[in-house]
Amino acid sequence: GVEINVKCSGSPQCLKPCKDAGMRFGKCMNRKCHCTPK
């Protein structure tokens, strides 16, 4: 995945930031959001 500079404590928090970044799916790893490119 692609790490974006968004802090998180759970994967659901990453859905919108990943969408806003033009990607889909978000996972929280090491307190940062990781997105899957389209």
Swiss-Prot record:
Is Disulfide bond given among the entry's keywords?
yes
Tissue specificity: Expressed by the venom gland.
> Which cysteines in this chain are paired by disulphide bridges?
8-28, 14-33, 18-35
The record's section on Pfam families has: Toxin_2
Keyword hit for Disulfide bond? yes
Q: What superkingdom does the record give?
A: Eukaryota
Per UniProt, subcellular location reads as: Secreted
Instruction: Print the keywords alphabetically.
Output: Disulfide bond, Ion channel impairing toxin, Neurotoxin, Potassium channel impairing toxin, Secreted, Toxin, Voltage-gated potassium channel impairing toxin
Q: Name one GO cellular component term.
A: extracellular region
InterPro entries, A to Z:
Scorpion_toxin-like_sf, Scorpion_toxinS_K_inh
Which stretches of sequence are listed as region Interaction with Ca(2+)-activated K(+) channels?
26-33
A molecular function annotated in GO for this UniProt entry is: ion channel inhibitor activity
Alphabetical list of SUPFAM superfamilies matching this protein: Scorpion toxin-like
Q: Additional comments on file?
A: Negative results: shows weak inhibition of large conductance calcium-activated potassium channels (KCa1.1/KCNMA1) (Ki=1560 nM). Shows weak or no inhibition on Kv1.2/KCNA2. Shows no effect on Kv1.5/KCNA5 and Kv3.1/KCNC1.
What is the protein's known function?
Potent inhibitor voltage-gated potassium channels Kv1.3/KCNA3 (Kd=0.65 nM) and Kv1.1/KCNA1 (Kd=41 nM). It appears to block channel activity by a simple bimolecular inhibition process. Induces a transient period of fast flickering in the channel openings, followed by an almost complete blockade of the channel. Its binding affinity to rat brain synaptosomes is 5-fold higher than this of KTX-3. Binding of the toxin to the channel is associated with significant structural rearrangements in both molecules.
Q: Please quote what the entry notes about the protein's domains.
A: Has the structural arrangement of an alpha-helix connected to a beta-sheet by disulfide bonds (CSalpha/beta).
Q: Which family does it belong to?
A: Belongs to the short scorpion toxin superfamily. Potassium channel inhibitor family. Alpha-KTx 03 subfamily.
Q: What is this protein called?
A: Potassium channel toxin alpha-KTx 3.1
Organism annotation: Androctonus mauritanicus mauritanicus (Scorpion)
